[in-house]
Each structure stands twice: as C-alpha cells, then as structure tokens.
C-alpha cells in the first residue's frame, strides 16, 4: 500500500488502515501470525481500532519451519510464511492447532467478527471486505488450454468473493456489489508457473523507471 508517499507493506492488517475513520477487522478465515500482526498494529498505529476474531487459527514457528522444507519450497513453490501448514491443521481438525483466543498478547484485540459485522450491516452501515491474492490462484484450480493451475500455481485456499463472505462471517445475500481489482502488470511471488512472464532486461528496466516495480511483502 502506498500512503502519503510512503510504501507500507502489509501482510496481516487490512489495507483500509489508511482511512483513520475506519474500524478494522480480521475474520476467522484468516490464519494469523501474532508477531507480524502486533508489529503492524504498532507500525501503522491502529491500536484501538483493529479487532481479531477469537477463532482465527495461529501460525506458529513449527508451521513456518514445515513450510520451508525443500519439497514445499521447490515443488509447491510456497512463500514460506507457515500459512499452508496452519491451514492444513485446520482441515485435518487436529487438536494441536491454536487459535487467537489462546494467545495472551492478542487478548486486547479479540471479538466475534461475524457478529460485529452483521450488527453493523443491520444498522445500515457500510462494510468493505478485502480478499487476498487473485481469483485464478484459488486452490480449486483453473484450466487454461492444456495447462492447469493446480497444484503448483495455486495458494492454500479458495480466493473467490464467495469464500470471502464465509471468512468474515456474513451471508452472500448481504453483499451489494463485488469489485474486481486489476493490475496493469501482473506479478507473482514464488516459483510456480507464470504465463507471459517478462524476462527481457530492457523491458524490466522500463517498468522500474515507470514506478511499476513490485516486490512481495
């Protein structure tokens, strides 16, 4: 996010933090790294207006270590954040998975996000739900000609607007409109397939000079 001329990398908090009048929520569909979240809360001064669902799964050190084993890095092209292993524990319904309510440092920020958002909607106020990544890296997979995005070109979960509703705890009938955000130049983090990737040094130089250079957070 670029705000007031500054580049603000965010991985946990919603990009709506740039609006000082907004209340920020992280729904239970998000797996949370407490260290990164607390750092961003302090860095972007959102303490007092950000709340986290009590049942957000927690990324622990063991998840990050597992995510960085050679197979996951080279075959599945993971970014190594621990998101995948934490999501997998939730799907497998293991008893070892921790939730936000189990982390002492997160207790000041806990709430039932779905309940809060539905109350806000019933009062006629506006809610903007922010998803991550792009539709075509949903782990449901897509076919493009003879190529399939699954398994190397997908992320750990579905990334469509429908799943976003479930992630934040609201029903799809509450949604008035869905906004799709496009970038003029596509980018990708990781080593998976990337059709039409620009590798020509001269073209890349022009992109950088035009201010369109992008780096993963």
Where are these regions (language model features)?
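Non-transmembrane, aqueous-exposed alpha-helical and coiled segments at domain scale
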Residues: 1-217
């Amino acid at each position: 996010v670029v705000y007031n001329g500054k580049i603000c990398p965010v991985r946990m908090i919603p990009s709506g933090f740039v609006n000082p009048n907004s209340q920020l929520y992280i729904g239970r569909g998000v797996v949370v790294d407490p260290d990164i979240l607390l750092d961003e809360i302090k860095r972007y001064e959102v303490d007092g207006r950000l709340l986290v669902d009590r049942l957000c799964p927690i990324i622990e050190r063991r998840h990050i270590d597992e995510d960085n084993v050679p197979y996951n890095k080279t075959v599945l092209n993971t970014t190594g954040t621990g998101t995948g292993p934490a999501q997998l524990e939730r799907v497998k319904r293991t008893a070892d998975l921790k939730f936000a309510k189990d982390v002492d440092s997160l207790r000041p920020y806990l709430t039932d996000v779905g309940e809060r958002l539905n109350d806000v909607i019933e009062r006629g106020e506006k809610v903007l739900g922010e998803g991550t990544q792009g539709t075509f890296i949903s782990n449901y997979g897509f076919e493009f000609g003879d190529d399939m995005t699954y398994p190397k070109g997908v992320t750990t979960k579905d990334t469509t607007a429908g799943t976003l509703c479930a992630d934040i705890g609201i029903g799809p009938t509450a949604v008035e409109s869905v906004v799709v955000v496009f970038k003029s130049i596509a980018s990708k983090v990781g080593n998976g397939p990337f059709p039409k990737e620009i590798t020509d040094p001269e073209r890349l130089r022009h992109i950088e000079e035009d201010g369109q250079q992008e780096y993963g957070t």
